[in-house]
Amino acid sequence: SVLRTGSAGGAVRLVQQKLNSLGERLKDDGKYGAATAAAVQRFQRRNGLTADGSVGCATWEKMF
């Protein structure tokens, strides 16, 4: 399933931790808020993905 603003849980925490390992400074609380969405957009732009701020299959595969 797609992770987006409003999502919560372990998968969101995993994304936050991965983004932090790449230089972001997110609170890894498992809550997908505006800061996480903005960090995901930066990741997507850096990796040639559609920068929609949501973590779907393509973003997940590139991230992990």
Residue ranges and their predicted role:
Residues 1-30:
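Acidic, Ser/Thr/Pro/Gly-enriched interdomain connector segments
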Residues 1-2, 62-64:
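Intrinsically disordered, low-complexity Ser/Thr-rich linker and spacer segments
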Residues 20-23, 46-50:
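Short capping motifs at secondary-structure boundaries
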Residues 40-43:
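Conserved hydrophobic/aromatic packing and binding residues within compact polymer-binding modules
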Residues 51-53, 62:
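Terminal recognition/anchoring or ligand-binding modules at protein termini
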